[in-house]
């Protein structure tokens, strides 16, 4: 769906942003009937509260939106967006100041609150529209919202309609829209050149493939690698029913990478962008890889399979090996890789790893600037021994259960040896409960933080 601002020439209703306790000073200059109405409503400016103000003729002439205390505003994401679903249909504009709130964040949150996933049923109207607040770069915020909407659509679509073939089609549509090139590697070539991607996906009726999209002719090179496991049964180490229900989101890394690519291409920075998506389904059949198998990767490293449900790092490893061969200025991988990451930081925060402090600092600062919370975890070298089994170079599922997100990241780092700057995001990709700007369902994580970091990381 299109998430855009209302046009400037459309009639609109003013919104007055009111801090908790600030309604009296605002109302002091208003007519008696307005002050009386606000009193009767009991509106004091609490977060997300709304008061519609009638004129003397009874028609709505303004809206008051509460954003809480300074402390509440400091810890809230998309504070203004909390009011969006509560307002009547129509177009609104912000009158006056935003009480210290960041205009870009509030404008984006409003657009994201209008997102609806309507592929399988008629959905309610996206509701109240907004003109961009003063100082907001309309084109940039709309580009970011469009990328996030794409990510959400891809994750929310069930695997029956978003398998490897459909993910390839979606990637092709994106490439055509922005004049990018895209190649799909499958069949015998995939088995020969990307053996671990092939091994993970060979049991499924929808053939595994590696998608390779390129955009931009000059500038620094950025390669994004997104995990595209379109459904994950766990393989022969089959998941319990409780663990399988949300596995349509196991391609959330690919969805996030493609959504970020959309943002980048729409904003047209001077860089060379490459997006690699290993697209597979981890299914069960007589062709499934087995616990105890040893696979040889594209890089030549051998991997002992101690759990077929740790398949994401296998497909990512072959794609990362390809990315590393080109030695771009920056490689970033995004994957719904481990449950351990959720245990560590919960569902809202995207943990990431970085090979250089400057990369970590830029991503951390970028996330803070755009309300996309991230948290650095360490590439802790002493844990390398945990991913080294007795009969192969690497173990895809170390026993013991300790430091699961770190050992998975260390596994991936083994395949990035020529590129000095590498960052890996271990995302969740799902909003369990609706929040301002974040309807329940698929959600992008880390993409906006990385986009905000690119000027520091690549000078674009």
Question: Can you name each region flagged by the protein language model?
Answer:
Residues 168-460:
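A generic structural signal for tightly packed, nonpolar segments enriched in small/aliphatic residues
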């Amino acid at each position: 769906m299109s998430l855009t601002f209302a046009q400037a020439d459309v009639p609109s209703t003013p919104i007055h942003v009111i801090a908790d306790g600030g309604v009296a000073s605002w109302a002091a200059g208003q007519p008696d009937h307005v002050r009386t109405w606000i009193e009767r409503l009991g509106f004091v400016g609490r977060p997300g509260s709304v008061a519609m103000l009638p004129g003397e003729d009874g028609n709505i002439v303004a809206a008051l939106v509460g954003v809480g205390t300074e402390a509440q505003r400091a810890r809230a994401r998309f504070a203004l967006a909390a009011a969006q679903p509560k307002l009547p249909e129509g177009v609104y504009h912000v009158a006056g100041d935003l009480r210290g709130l960041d205009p870009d964040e509030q404008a984006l949150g409003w657009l994201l609150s209008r997102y609806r996933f309507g592929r399988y049923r008629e959905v309610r109207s996206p509701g109240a529209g907004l003109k961009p607040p003063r100082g907001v770069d309309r084109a940039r915020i709309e580009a970011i919202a469009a990328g996030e909407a794409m990510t959400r659509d891809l994750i929310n679509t069930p695997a029956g309609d978003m398998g490897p073939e459909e993910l390839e089609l979606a990637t092709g549509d994106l490439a055509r829209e922005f004049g990018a090139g895209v190649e799909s590697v499958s069949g015998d070539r995939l088995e020969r050149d990307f053996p671990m991607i092939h091994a993970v996906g060979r049991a499924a009726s929808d053939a595994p493939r590696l998608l390779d999209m390129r955009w931009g002719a000059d500038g620094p090179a950025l390669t994004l690698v997104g995990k595209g496991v379109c459904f994950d049964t766990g393989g022969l180490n089959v998941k319990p029913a409780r663990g399988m229900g949300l596995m349509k989101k196991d391609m959330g890394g690919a969805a996030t990478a493609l959504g970020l690519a959309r943002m980048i291409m729409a904003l047209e920075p001077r860089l060379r962008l490459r997006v690699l998506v290993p697209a597979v389904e981890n299914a069960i059949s007589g062709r499934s890889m087995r616990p105890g198998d040893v696979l040889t990767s594209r890089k030549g490293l051998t991997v002992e399979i101690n759990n077929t449900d740790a398949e994401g790092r296998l497909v990512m490893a072959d794609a990362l090996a390809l990315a590393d061969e080109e030695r771009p200025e920056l490689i970033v991988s995004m994957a719904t890789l481990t449950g351990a990451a959720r245990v560590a930081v919960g569902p809202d925060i995207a943990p990431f790893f970085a090979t250089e402090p400057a990369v970590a600092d830029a991503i951390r600062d970028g996330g803070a600037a755009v309300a996309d919370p991230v948290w650095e975890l360490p590439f802790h070298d002493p844990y390398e021994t945990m991913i080294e089994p007795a009969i192969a170079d690497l173990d895809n599922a170390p026993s013991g259960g300790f430091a699961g997100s770190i050992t998975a990241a260390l596994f991936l780092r083994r395949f990035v040896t020529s590129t000095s700057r590498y960052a890996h995001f271990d995302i969740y990709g799902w909003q369990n409960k609706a929040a301002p700007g974040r309807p329940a369902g698929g959600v992008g994580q880390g993409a906006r933080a990385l986009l905000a970091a690119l000027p520091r990381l690549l000078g674009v």
